[in-house]
């Protein structure tokens, strides 16, 4: 194998073996992913975000994956932004005043990458950084004849990484130590997305999206309880004076059972009445849910009219918002 040189023309040692298979890293990588969004509260969310600011990315990473999985609106809006990159044309161009060899190399690389079956998946996996702030993919090397090639690109769980405690802008691979281990040269593709200015653990959209997610889901839960109370007719069983405890229990079972089935039986001399459902308005809950979804759309796409027309959603406004989305 020929020597590999850096951008300054200096050779360096290169290990083609995958770094994640070395040392104690496989034990770190075998962790179970937590689901911190279950029953999430503002205080618990703040703890996850503060941990990431200090270099511990695990809780925030799991939180980001959890809200993307649980919120269909967030998933759809994020998917629009992630998939948009697939349609952007690209090419490998030689540098200015390139030599004949440089032009030939650029042409060869362009042809190779356009034909690589892993390239589109790698682009999509890189956009995981939009939500989490970073996405790390490990390179699997191989040989094709005498040519050194990339055989595959393996996405790695974002919880497998940490920040260098001496430089919170530097991502490192977790190995069980306090500071982690630096990425080996030519072993990784690392994309760090900046939705806001900050260090490595504070640039992902998850830090903005978690708040409308929490308040929206409070209202979704409250709406479900509201519909359970106000959306069904009240069932009232009446028993005659002197009914035995066994008869009362039989009537109660009939009242509860008939709510799940279309028929039932009750003891003779007893009656079952259906009363109109209690009056109530779901508008406050729906308003809060709508606010949460609009806030999510604004944070991800820069607007809302590419998702829903709204009360005054004119076509021209929708086109303006679509241009904003494309620019993002």
Language-model features and meaning:
Residues 82, 90-93:
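Active-site acidic/histidine clusters and adjacent loop/turn architecture
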Residues 2-57, 63-74, 92-258:
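Structured, contiguous alpha/beta core segments that scaffold functional sites
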Residues 236-242, 264-328:
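Surface-exposed loop-to-helix/strand elements on domain peripheries
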